[in-house]
């Protein structure tokens, strides 16, 4: 009896493996499309430029906060080394000296200049917040008081948490583990993993707390793990590039640290944004499933009608949607297909983008008929059908019949779209 079930079990396993592979391929395509659509590499460039302008003010604020607490004074040098050497591989010591020299000069500036440094540091955090929320399709800025409180908390509590972590780690390593015996090798390996673990924790908190959307813990952890691995690979590649390939020192001399610093900061922001995009895609990805849609000539209208119905209902509720928000409402549709349809409706001036990047209706659905929408949506014709339609040797004169069909369609599809959507909504409510 068991032997008879073996082929069936193998068949089901093969089907399951094939579905997993198809789902993985579809997710990779979805992830790649979102990377290009959200212009991750352009956003990373703008963040890198702003980071170069803000790095000294941020370090000045961080070190000023630490100076307020004498208990953290012994760990200040450790924090400086940790931030700078992990901030840029290969040139950390040189950069350490420059940055501390610049930060030291900020102590002599007047009160107005100190406030300006603080504002610059806050602006960097605000840009990071806005860029990450753009990935989730959230363009509504935080309220001024809420944003100020959040950024102030990050600037003040962030350094304290890092120093506390370093202090706790130092206590564990130097009290529990000794420099002699079998635990020495274990201690060395754990210390080597410490920066990687710190990266995972930092990315996890970033992806969990910054987006103004509910993010699953598993998705945030997966994104943090991916970003941490990419960061480690980027460090190794950058170290190899600087030591074996780059010619910055031959061209710029003492100023070579500037382009190298910008290049590394750009890579770091690419890693951060790629990880955020990965977290978003884990939550937004929904593989297409076959539906029982009628296979008639009107089947191409189901998608645009779903888009218009969703936007129409959202606008009536006073909550317009962006493309990302629309994809969450229509989660069963592939994102690529939905984006192409939205682009088509934008091109045909049925929709337009508001100043905040939200989708809005350009046509009055109470005046626009179903036939007008039918004319807008292209119906694909395969190569065989084209050859039959346009073959001169076997031409069939269908012009009179085509006119009659068009007239019939125009008459039968004169129903306004809004009325059709209302009837569909009432029917769905009755069924429920």
Swiss-Prot record:
UniProt keyword terms in alphabetical order: Cell inner membrane, Cell membrane, Membrane, Transmembrane, Transmembrane helix
Keyword RNA-binding: no
Keyword Ribonucleoprotein: no
Main location as per UniProt: membrane
One CC-aspect GO term: plasma membrane
Top-rank lineage group of the source organism: Bacteria
One Pfam family from the record: Virul_fac_BrkB
Membrane topology recorded in Swiss-Prot or TrEMBL: Multi-pass membrane protein
Localization (cell): Cell inner membrane
Transmembrane segments: 52-72, 108-128, 148-168, 190-210, 220-240, 254-274
HAMAP family (UniProt xref): UPF0761
NCBIfam families: yihY_not_rbn (TIGR00765)
Family from the record: Belongs to the UPF0761 family.
Identification of the protein by name: UPF0761 membrane protein Cag_0935
Organism: Chlorobium chlorochromatii (strain CaD3)
Origin organism lineage: Bacteria, Pseudomonadati, Chlorobiota, Chlorobiia, Chlorobiales
